[in-house]
Amino acid sequence: MTLLLLGAVLLVAQPQLVHSHPAAPGPGLKQQELLRKVIILPEDTGEGTASNGSTQQLPQTIIIGVRKGGTRALLEMLSLHPDVAAAENEVHFFDWEEHYSQGLGWYLTQMPFSSPHQLTVEKTPAYFTSPKVPERIHSMNPTIRLLLILRDPSERVLSDYTQVLYNHLQKHKPYPPIEDLLMRDGRLNLDYKALNRSLYHAHMLNWLRFFPLGHIHIVDGDRLIRDPFPEIQKVERFLKLSPQINASNFYFNKTKGFYCLRDSGKDRCLHESKGRAHPQVDPKLLDKLHEYFHEPNKKFFKLVGRTFDWH
């Protein structure tokens, strides 16, 4: 079984040997060393294979971002499909050097056990805005299908701030008001990282250096929240999955104010950290945000050949 597993992994990794754009490995780690780490798995340990015959597979689909764009909701909804096996945690393989340096063998161990017919999906929102990641993923599998969920850039900035704020509050640490982070000397603080993460055009250009647009499906995060079923149908078609998810899998929870999931008669909602109210922001500051993102948004629309209902 170990030999069969290794053969499958090497088949996925094979493009590394012939492609003209090799990955940018961590310091001191060469491309062949990455392959070697896949080849050398412990003998007779059963690693990568369960007693029921299921195996761990490298992902055929990755949700690459964007942070605070709705990636968790997308993964949970996609997991309703019986032919999808999703990694439970964010792996951060391609963007964290301490993980990437351990090679594809380590990455494989982070994947869920799945049947041969299932599609393995991994989600790490930081991938979209990490410069090295597109080339590294392409080196692993140039035909992989990528999912990118985006929302209104200004709203994404506010959600980004809200998450960090709550993280600080839980640790009883102070955190400045959003106005102090967004503004500097009467102007937008362009060094604020949350702003950069919402410049979708710049990040998308980097991905299109390595993947054709047809390999990247953009999910409208705002529509996914308002009416999830049509957006998930598009994802099913993009991934060439049979249409198994239906409208009855979603119901609107009036208490929470957003859609929850119904799977095999069991209801479940996203974690309470999802859908938090954003802080009150001066309308003039919001106008500055909308103005700042206006031109980058137009460039993004032209780049991907579609528009979104953003400010």
Swiss-Prot record:
InterPro entries in UniProt? NST/OST, P-loop_NTPase, Sulfotransferase_dom
Residues carrying a glycan: 52, 196, 246, 253
Q: Does the keyword field hold Transferase?
A: yes
Consequence of changing residue 132 to A: Decreases the enzymatic activity
Keywords attached to this entry: Disulfide bond, Glycoprotein, Golgi apparatus, Signal, Transferase
Alphabetical GO biological process terms: glycosaminoglycan biosynthetic process; heparan sulfate proteoglycan biosynthetic process
What Pfam families does this protein's entry cite? Answer: Sulfotransfer_1 (PF00685)
The record lists the catalysed reaction(s) as: alpha-D-glucosaminyl-[heparan sulfate](n) + 3'-phosphoadenylyl sulfate = 3-sulfo-alpha-D-glucosaminyl-[heparan sulfate](n) + adenosine 3',5'-bisphosphate + H(+)
Report the outcome of residue 88 to A: Decreases the enzymatic activity
The answer to whether keyword Disulfide bond applies is yes
**Cell location:** Golgi apparatus lumen
Swapping residue 95 to A/N leads to an effect described as:
Abolishes the enzymatic activity
Where are the membrane-spanning stretches?
A: none
Which Cys residues form disulphide pairs? 260-269
| Endpoints of the signal sequence | 1-20
Q: What is the effect of changing residue 72 to A/E?
A: Abolishes the enzymatic activity
Q: Which GO terms describe its cellular component?
A: Golgi apparatus; Golgi lumen
List the EC numbers from the record.
Answer: 2.8.2.23
Return the similarity comment.
Belongs to the sulfotransferase 1 family.
PANTHER family reported in the protein's UniProt record: HEPARAN SULFATE GLUCOSAMINE 3-O-SULFOTRANSFERASE 1 (PTHR10605:SF16), HEPARAN SULFATE SULFOTRANSFERASE (PTHR10605)
Tell me the function of this protein: Sulfotransferase that utilizes 3'-phospho-5'-adenylyl sulfate (PAPS) to catalyze the transfer of a sulfo group to position 3 of glucosamine residues in heparan. Catalyzes the rate limiting step in the biosynthesis of heparan sulfate (HSact). This modification is a crucial step in the biosynthesis of anticoagulant heparan sulfate as it completes the structure of the antithrombin pentasaccharide binding site.
* Descriptive protein name: Heparan sulfate glucosamine 3-O-sulfotransferase 1
The organism is Mus musculus (Mouse)
Q: Source gene? A: Hs3st1
